[in-house]
Every structure is written in C-alpha cells, then in structure tokens.
C-alpha cells in the first residue's frame, strides 16, 4: 500500500461512494469522521463503530478539524462549508484520488456527457473475455474503492464530472472523453467549467483516445503522449472509423481494414457504432487482441434504459432510452434510430420532458424536424421544451407516461419507432431514470 497514515480524515456526504470511502479509510487504520446534511443519510447504518458521525447539517467545526476532506460527488466544492476548509489550507479530494494513491494498477478512465456506461461496460467485457482480471465501476455499479477487494490487474472506471472535480493526476493507462454536450450547468456554472472538470481525466495519462467528431473531446496533452481517435467517418491509417460499400453496407474499420459490419451488432444506431469504435481504440491501447474484442462486440446486447429495444407492437418498435437525461443523449438516440429507419420511410414518435436542468433544448430542433412525426411532452419543463422546438413537428402533451405511450401508439404506423428519450432528469414524476424506464416498459407491454 502506498497510502500514508496521518491526521483526521472527514468524509463529507454519505451515499454509496461516501460509505465506501469511510470503510476503506477505517480499514486502513485512519482516524475517520463523517458528516452529512441529511438527518438519516443513505448508508448511515453501514458505518463502522469508532467512526464519529455528525448528521443533520454539514458540520463546519468537524470539517475545519480535518487533515483532509473526502468529498462525495453529490456535494459541490463550492459549498461555503467546503470553501471555508479550503481557505484554511485543508486538502479536499474524492474517492477516486484515494484509489489512485492506494494502487498502481493500470486504469482505463472513461468520461463523457453520454455513453459512458455503455463504453465502460463493453470495454470491461472485452478485457474479461481476453483473459484479464478486471474490475469495473466508479460512477457505474460498484464504488471505485470497493474494486480493490478483487485484487484486479486492470481497473475500468466510469467517471463523472463531479468525481473528476476532486481528482488530480489520475495517471490513467488510457483516458477518453467520449463526447461533450451541455449537462450539469447548474453545478459547473457554464460549459467552460464543465469542460475543465471533464478534461482533468487526462492529467498524467499515458495514452489518450478522442472523438474526431467532437472538438471538445480532444485533449491538450504533451506531444509525446500517444493518441488514438475514433469517428463516424473514413479513418486515417491506424485510426478507427467507418467505411461504406457501394451497396450502402457500413463497416467498422481501422484505417482501410474492414473489421465488422454494423448490421452484425445487436446494438443499433450510429451512436452505438461510435461507442463500439471507442471501445476498440481503448482496447488496442491496453493491448487486447482484435479478434477477441470483435467476438465480444458481436455478443454485446447493450444496457437497460439506454436505447434498449423493448417490443414490437403492430410493426412499430418501442425503445427505452430513459438514461437519455440530457440533450446530447437524446440527439444521439433520435439521429441513430431516425437514420436507421429512414430507408423504409419510418419516422420517430418521441417522448420528451422532465426536469431540464437549465439546458438549451433548441439543438433538438433540426433532428426532430428531420426524423420525428410527433413529440409528446411530459413533466415539469414541457413548456420550456415546447418553446424551443415549436414548429419543428406536431407537438402533443400528456399528463402521465401511460397517456404519452398511448398517444404515440395512436400516431404511428408500420416501420415507425416510439422512443422514450426525455433529455431531462426524472425526479419530477419518478424515483429515478430506472423507475421511468421500467414504467415505460410496463406501459408498452400493456398495449394491445
């Protein structure tokens, strides 16, 4: 272990990663305390005896006694209690920083506004299928520090901008920002703040992967850092992209080498082609054999609530993209499915709405105009979205998700698709995006 024993470590904010940090530090023999503004925060019953707890408010006095504060990703460093500690010279880090100090196991680090979970899961499976002892987690599934219990030879981490804010010099084996679109501006203030947080992933990276189609994903790293790119265009030598045959067949390719037809993948839509290419680039960077990666890719069926195929009813296919909680994700889903069904004159019936998080919805206009026959609006920010897309296509309103699904069924015909991709958070009407997705699936299954 490379970790140093020292003074009091105060974990601010419980939840999954907070509990994980408390237990990890306690096991390492540190003096640990924890504070949370909630009177009974989730995980409060999983705190070891001997750890001081202060719940009901962020305990300013306790924070100022800390040698170091471990900030949970749900809490902003801008909070006055945290700023007071920073002003006193107290170090503020997150669980990812603790992980980096505790191990020198190579890390594949993945962030982006969208597709993080799909890419993280897929590259994890590719590594496992190639015989690596890999542990996958971070912002997805298991908290990062818990992964060390597996004694892995490789860590694959999905990282959010909130986690990266408190991480420096991650020194990843390979790092990628998959894409950048407006999200969490309520936390980061503006696009620049969000961009800066995301790009912390590249600090000390040995290799980097970037998206040629998204200039904001390209890192500023030393010229000596090996760089690999992916994009939905013809690739240069040794880069990843797509090649089209004269008959329209689309191939995933590396340089001029055709690797696999897009039609051979379970995961459909151009956004998923980009995800697959990103994984191939990441896999190459950590030395995974191409043949093994392509085999994994052929078997991969995608993730729940992420452009997940639900059912076909009267020749209309229904897709659950409840994880589409921002404009960029929804654009990828509309464009991906819209382009795929356009050949057969199919159109998209789109369910949009929820809590908009201060986003600008106008970038949806042109794709809605091109691919959507109807948009059904739900939730708190329906009026904001309506204003942004007015005139692009037919707009309807629904008070419930069930009503929205029924309206879509009424408006569609054979070869069309119904897509739930709300571009919004779910908490106005649902417990979570999972809950929203499950309710959508139940509504679709009850259609006749």
Swiss-Prot record:
GO CC entries: cytoplasm
Predominant cellular place of this UniProt entry's protein: cytoplasm
Catalysed transformations (reactions): UDP-N-acetyl-alpha-D-muramoyl-L-alanine + D-glutamate + ATP = UDP-N-acetyl-alpha-D-muramoyl-L-alanyl-D-glutamate + ADP + phosphate + H(+)
Alphabetized Pfam families for the sequence: Mur_ligase_C, Mur_ligase_M, MurD-like_N
Gene3D superfamilies linked: Mur ligase, C-terminal domain, Mur-like, catalytic domain, NAD(P)-binding Rossmann-like Domain
NCBIfam families: murD
Official protein name in the record: UDP-N-acetylmuramoylalanine--D-glutamate ligase
Organism: Acinetobacter baumannii (strain ATCC 17978 / DSM 105126 / CIP 53.77 / LMG 1025 / NCDC KC755 / 5377)
Gene behind the chain: murD
């Amino acid at each position: 272990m490379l970790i140093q024993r020292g003074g009091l470590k105060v974990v601010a904010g419980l939840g999954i990663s907070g509990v994980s940090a408390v237990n990890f530090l306690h096991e390492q023999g540190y003096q640990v305390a924890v504070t949370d503004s909630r009177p009974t925060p989730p995980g409060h019953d999983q705190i070891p005896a001997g750890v001081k707890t202060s719940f009901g408010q962020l305990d300013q006095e306790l924070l100022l006694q800390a040698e170091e504060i471990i900030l949970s990703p749900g809490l902003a460093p801008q909070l006055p209690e945290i700023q007071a500690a920073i002003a006193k010279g107290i170090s503020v880090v997150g669980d990812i920083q603790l992980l980096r100090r505790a191990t020198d196991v190579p890390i594949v680090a993945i962030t982006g506004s969208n597709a993080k979970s799909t890419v993280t899961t897929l590259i994890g499976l590719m590594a496992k299928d190639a015989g690596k002892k890999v542990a996958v987690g971070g912002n997805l599934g298991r908290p990062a520090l818990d992964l060390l219990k597996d004694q892995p030879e490789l860590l694959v981490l999905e990282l959010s901008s909130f986690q990266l804010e408190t991480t420096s010099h991650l020194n990843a084996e390979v790092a990628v920002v998959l894409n950048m679109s407006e999200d969490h501006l309520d936390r980061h203030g503006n696009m620049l703040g969000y961009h800066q947080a995301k790009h912390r992933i590249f600090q000390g990276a040995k290799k980097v992967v970037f998206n040629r189609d998204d200039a904001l994903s390209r890192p500023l790293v030393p010229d000596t850092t090996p760089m690999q790119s992916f994009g939905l265009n013809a690739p240069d030598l040794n880069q990843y992209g797509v090649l089209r045959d004269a008959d329209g067949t689309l191939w995933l390719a590396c340089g001029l080498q055709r690797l696999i037809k897009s039609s051979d993948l379970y995961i459909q839509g151009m956004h998923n082609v980009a995800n697959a290419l990103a994984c191939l680039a990441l896999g190459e960077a950590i030395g995974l054999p191409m043949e093994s990666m392509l085999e994994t890719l052929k078997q991969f069926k995608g993730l729940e609530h992420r452009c997940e195929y639900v059912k076909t009813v009267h020749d209309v296919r229904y897709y659950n993209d409840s994880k589409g909680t921002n404009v960029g994700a929804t654009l990828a889903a509309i464009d991906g499915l819209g382009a795929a069904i356009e050949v057969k004159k199919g159109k998209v019936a789109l369910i949009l709405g929820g809590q908009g998080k201060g986003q600008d919805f106008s970038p949806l206009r042109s794709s809605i105009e091109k691919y959507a026959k109807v948009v059904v609006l739900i939730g708190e920010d329906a009026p904001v979205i309506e204003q942004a897309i007015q005139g692009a296509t037919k707009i309807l309103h629904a008070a419930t998700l069930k009503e929205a699904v029924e309206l879509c069924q009424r408006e569609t015909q054979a070869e069309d698709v119904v897509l739930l991709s709300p571009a919004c958070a779910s908490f106005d009407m649902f417990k979570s995006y999972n809950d929203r997705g499950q309710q959508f699936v139940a509504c679709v299954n009850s259609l006749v």
